[in-house]
From Swiss-Prot:
It comes from Ovophis okinavensis (Ryukyu Island pit viper). InterPro entries: NADH_UbQ_OxRdtase, ND/Mrp_TM. GO terms for molecular function: NADH dehydrogenase (ubiquinone) activity; ubiquinone binding. This is NADH-ubiquinone oxidoreductase chain 4. The keyword tRNA-binding does not apply. The gene is MT-ND4. The lineage of its organism: Eukaryota, Metazoa, Chordata, Craniata, Vertebrata.
Length: 231
């Protein structure tokens, strides 16, 4: 069920990060050097999840692994225990909550018309559903964290906090973000570009679907314009 996937990616997955933030506040203050193994594990987990995204052929699985990779960055930022790290983690959880939920919604829109989630079989939708292609482009750009979205602000805060703590982490962060851009563009090009494989009659997108995506995009744009609301 797509509603379950949207709630899972947008809310339940982020509750773990929120729980870690609350736990870190009640734990006694310790040197961040003790958290180095967890930091490396979180960043390495983010890279592995990103690499898993690259080899996915199932659209829904790709978006799910994308959510997991972003949570690796969130955990790494929380562990540092700096104001920038916590602000970046909170902002990324909120921003990616909207983004991943919108991506799942778009994946369902595609599935309802093609009856498959295989990337190669869903291509050529830009000729059939041009407005849905626009939504795909916007959400993928937000997933990549292009400015001036909230995703960009949050990842910039996380990168700054991690680089200030240990400059070597920029290698893992840079690799993670490069792979994120690769699979996001791959997902967009695979589902939208090319020629459609089926000649079946496809019904146009409904107003309810546009409304659903708009209700994801508008709060994200508002938070991007006024980040003081959450940072």
């Amino acid at each position: 069920p797509i509603a379950g996937s949207m709630v899972l990616a947008a809310i339940l997955l982020k509750l773990g990060g929120y729980g870690i933030i609350r736990m870190m506040q009640i734990l006694p203050t310790t040197k961040t050097d003790l958290f180095l193994p967890f930091m490396v594990l979180a960043l390495w987990g983010a890279i592995l999840a990103n690499l898993t995204c690259l080899q996915q052929t199932d659209l829904k699985s790709l978006i799910a692994y994308s959510s997991i990779s972003h949570m690796g960055l969130v955990v790494a930022a929380i562990i540092i225990q700096t104001p920038w790290g916590l602000s970046g983690a909170m902002a990324l959880m909120i921003a990616h909550g909207f983004t991943s939920s919108a991506l799942f919604c778009l994946a369902n829109t595609t599935y309802e018309r093609t009856h498959t989630r295989i990337l190669i079989l869903t291509r050529g939708l830009h000729n059939i559903l041009p407005m849905a292609t626009t939504w795909w482009l916007l959400t993928n750009l937000m997933n990549i964290a292009t400015p001036p979205t909230m995703n960009f602000t949050s990842e910039l805060l996380i990168m700054s906090a991690l680089f200030n703590w240990c400059p070597t982490t920029i290698i893992m962060l840079g690799l993670s973000m490069l792979i994120t851009a690769s699979y996001s563009l791959h997902m967009f090009l695979s589902t939208q570009m090319g020629s459609a494989l089926t000649n079946n009659q496809t019904e146009p997108t409904h107003s309810r679907e546009h409304l659903l995506i708009t209700l994801h995009i508008i709060p994200l744009v508002m938070v991007s314009l006024k980040p003081e609301l959450i940072i």
